Amino acid sequence: MWAIIGIPVTVLLILYRCKPSIFSTMSEHTLDWVRDKAIGWSHTPPRNKIDTHHHCVPSFYAKAVEEQGGDPSGWPTPHWSPLASKLLMKRVGVETAVLSVTAPGACIMPSRSERAQLARKLNEYSAELRDKDPESFAFFVSLPSILDTEDALAEIAYGLDTLHADGVTLFTRYGSTNTYLGHADVEPIWAELDRRGCVVFIHPTHPVDTNPVNSKLPQPSIDYPHETTRTAMDMITNKTRLKYPRCKVILSHAGGALPYIISRVTTPMSKAPDFAVSHRMGITHDQAMESFRSFHFDLALSSSPQVLDMLLRMVPHDHILYGSDFPYAPITAYPAFLEALESYEMDPELREMINFGNAMKLFPRLSTPRGGSL
């Protein structure tokens, strides 16, 4: 309808981001349409992908975050609806999106009971979406703070046994200090997830220090990848991956800086006796590399040629997954990273593995025929 009155949709999108009050009377469907039309899509690829990094932002969750002062990272909570997800999925060629709630999640709430209540509400909402359209949506369980151990274990059981979720989301860090995922306090959570052979999606959250480098660099753009690196190295050096090998662990954003950093830690280890390295680092060189290669890596905001070059050299090809990071990325990121992935030279079999084949192995429910040959 806006094209009729001659207003370019790109101008409307800028107005929406800068002056959202202008659109206060506009329906969600129209907002989603404006955003979709404003993106510079070059083409529509086949719909065969499984998007393992795709967020839902129900209105009650967005309200809860804003009532607590907003996302501590400083990143604005985006407009989202199921329709917005489906429009994006069509554009990037996604058949099924595995929904998750990103940080801060239920941890935004100040009290233990409120965290548990919000996590339960998020999970029941996600399950309802999945039940209405199981071909389009799957979901990861949202948890209260995993430092509220009993509450987190109860929600794992409810989410997996009652709601039949496809996995569980963990954030990179919990509490007011650096309790990363290799910490002893997290062991009961890992033990239960390992007992179940669970798929675990690790998403970064803000570091303790929320001050950005400068006003031009939103914290998630550079600090989130480093938080993923910190928690992964914490898990490696504390042998979390070796102790709980039945968990299939997905690292967001191609593992952050981990593929680049791992050799900085492990190369010196390769020249020292195992007993000396183990005494100093808690793990040998071979154990560290085994742990590193055990992770799965999604390509959300990470399909540029330089990242793909490194990832394909360093990790098993059947551990690389497609991801979009919708709706939290800048609006131009989706066509840009899609084009980068599609223009990267690889054989058709590998492309199908990344787009959907590897995810089908993690999520048996999604193992249905798709637009490729796998």
Where are these regions (language model features)?
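Conserved N-terminal glycine/acidic-rich loop preference
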Residues: 199-202, 226-237, 241, 257-281, ...
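Active-site core of metal-dependent hydrolases
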Residues: 217-229, 242-243, 249-253, 259, ...
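Active-site-adjacent C-terminal substructures of enzyme catalytic domains
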Residues: 225, 246, 277-331
